[in-house]
Amino acid sequence: MIMASSAAASISMITLRNLSRNHQSHQSTFLGFSRSFHNQRISSNSPGLSTRARSTTSSTGGFFRTICSSSSNDYSRPTKIQELNVYEFNEGDRNSPAVLKLGKKPDQLCLGDLVPFTNKLYTGDLTKRIGITAGLCVLIQHVPEKKGDRFEASYSFYFGDYGHISVQGPYLTYEDTFLAITGGSGVFEGAYGQVKLRQLVYPTKLFYTFYLKGVAADLPVELTGKHVEPSKEVKPAAEAQATQPGATIANFTN
């Protein structure tokens, strides 16, 4: 078991180095229907017909106004924007990422290659371990003029008992980007909006700012403290890394 764990960790670190090497290599090279009354030969001059027509039109209009009003009330969502900052770190101990090769070059990332991953999450102030990310990236474009790559990403952020947030969109190795918030659970139920991703150290250190809409209640205070300004040098508090009492949220996702 120890040897297997060591081997898996070694493979993970090799994958991280290959991702970084692939990134560095670019620096050197790269949404009615209608019906006619003419054929039915019905005279529109008939008083009875006109009265019935007006009555029907009035009733129909009232019906649709009622339906539309009801639908609007049923599907209205909170539009207040709530901000949430989190850090993501790959600390080399989750056997992540992996690379599933679909391209023809075994020694470098190719279009279509799949990169499943899971990393650790910390609060924006770096004092508490809150959970993990888990998802999948697909390499869709080499961008030589930017000296990097473009991935299409679909993944989730897990916050223990608080629930999770799912996102989807572009992941760029060379600049900041925005992804769509596609939903959530727990305190994040009904969430939508966008999240800004800041690449601090590719691919091991990232900073996210969520602009959350659709969440009825205020976010938990322990998730929304003042964040540490992002930089390449930031790191979690030692107590949070060690998941000591008081340095994690309740039942954090591991």
From Swiss-Prot:
Subcellular location: Plastid, Chloroplast
GO cellular component: chloroplast; extracellular region; plasma membrane
Transit peptide feature, positions: 1-52
EC number: 5.3.99.6
Transit peptide listed as a keyword: yes
Induction and repression of expression: Low local and systemic induction by wounding.
Uppermost EC category: isomerase
Domain of life according to the entry: Eukaryota
Statement: the UniProt record of this protein carries the keyword Plastid: yes
GO molecular function: allene-oxide cyclase activity
Any single GO BP term: jasmonic acid biosynthetic process
InterPro entries documented for this protein: Allene_ox_cyc, Allene_oxi_cyc_Dirigent, Allene_oxi_cyc_sf
Tissue expr: Highly expressed in fully developed leaves.
Catalytic activity: (9Z,13S,15Z)-12,13-epoxyoctadeca-9,11,15-trienoate = (9S,13S,15Z)-12-oxophyto-10,15-dienoate
The entry's keywords: Chloroplast, Isomerase, Plastid, Transit peptide
More details: The four allene oxide cyclase proteins (AOC1, AOC2, AOC3 and AOC4) are encoded by duplicated genes. They are very similar, and most experiments involving antibodies do not discriminate between the different members.
Family: Belongs to the allene oxide cyclase family.
Main function: Involved in the production of 12-oxo-phytodienoic acid (OPDA), a precursor of jasmonic acid.
UniProt protein name: Allene oxide cyclase 4, chloroplastic
